[in-house]
Structures are given as structure tokens and as C-alpha cells.
Design a protein with these regions (language model features):
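Bacterial Sec-dependent N-terminal signal peptides
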Residues: 1-21
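Zn2+-dependent metallopeptidase catalytic domains
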Residues: 18-159
């Protein structure tokens, strides 16, 4: 019962936070683009995850819909750079949740778990994406890749 009340409270906070500035969805003014922890509130996380997942999916869709022949740059490198906003939001959330958890943070964690699982499946089970990775992998010997590039290609192919 109390968990339902907490989740309802988080959802209400989420609705009101849509009207305020979300520090995850704006460029940080802190040195080196560091997170502005003093501006981050619990209600910012869920909308930030939603926006970041939508952005990451769009980046994956751009890779799979690219009409050009798959190359290391337009497929593997593009995958490596996709999801950076999601990585930032998730990195901050999971670390703060571990170091300074609360019932509200746990409610957010419960809400984002299925979203993150769905996104992970969206990438790992994406047949057109795998076909592009496979096409690059099959010509790896002729690409003159550096060791780190080859490792990245092999990791993407095997995952």
C-alpha cells in the first residue's frame, strides 16, 4: 500500500516536472559539462529517461535506415556514439540511487527497469542493425582496422 502511494507521488511529481526545466535535458553550465547535482531532483529522472531512450532509439533507427553500404564508421562507430544522453542519465541515476537512495528513488528504479530492458532488447534483437554489423564484420580483414576498432567490431558482432 505504501509503495503505491509513493509511486503515485512520484508520478504526480513527474507530471509537474514536465513544466519545469529538467537539468538532464539542458546543457550543463558547470565546468567540463559536469552534472549540476544541486539542480537535479528525483522527479527529473523519469522524464529524462523517457527522453533519452527516445533519443537513443532514434539514433539506432538512423543507423538501420542509412541507405549507404555498412561501414565501420556509419555502423559500428555510430553505435558506439549512440545513447550518450541515456548513458549520462543512467550513470547519474544508478550511482545516486546506490549512494543516497530513498523510497522515491526506488519507485523511479522500478519504473525505469522495464523501460531499460525494452531498450536493451530493442538494440540487441534489432535484425536490421545486426545485418549491418554482420556486413562490416564479414569484411573486417580488408578494413585495416586498429586493434581497438577490431575489438569493438568483434564485441558488437558477438553481442
Amino acid at each position: 500500500m505504501i509503495r503505491k502511494v509513493i509511486i503515485a507521488g512520484v508520478m504526480l511529481a513527474l507530471i509537474s516536472s514536465c513544466k519545469m526545466e529538467n537539468p538532464f535535458l539542458t546543457e550543463s553550465k558547470a565546468p567540463f559539462g559536469a552534472p549540476e547535482f544541486d539542480k537535479i531532483k528525483t522527479e527529473h529522472y523519469l522524464p529524462a529517461f523517457e527522453a533519452a531512450i527516445a533519443e537513443a532509439k532514434a539514433e539506432i533507427d538512423a543507423i538501420t535506415s542509412n541507405p549507404d553500404e555498412p561501414t565501420f564508421e556509419n555502423t559500428i562507430e555510430a553505435m558506439e556514439y549512440s545513447g550518450q544522453t541515456l548513458n549520462k542519465v543512467a550513470g547519474i541515476f544508478y550511482n545516486v540511487n546506490e549512494a543516497h537512495t530513498s523510497d522515491e528513488m526506488q519507485a523511479v528504479a522500478e519504473a525505469i527497469a522495464p523501460m531499460m530492458t525494452e531498450y536493451s532488447m530493442y538494440v540487441s534483437l534489432n535484425a536490421p542493425l545486426f545485418e549491418r554489423v554482420k556486413a562490416v564484420y564479414e569484411k573486417k580483414d580488408s578494413l585495416n582496422l586498429e586493434k581497438d576498432q577490431l575489438k569493438l567490431l568483434e564485441d558488437n558482432y558477438k553481442s
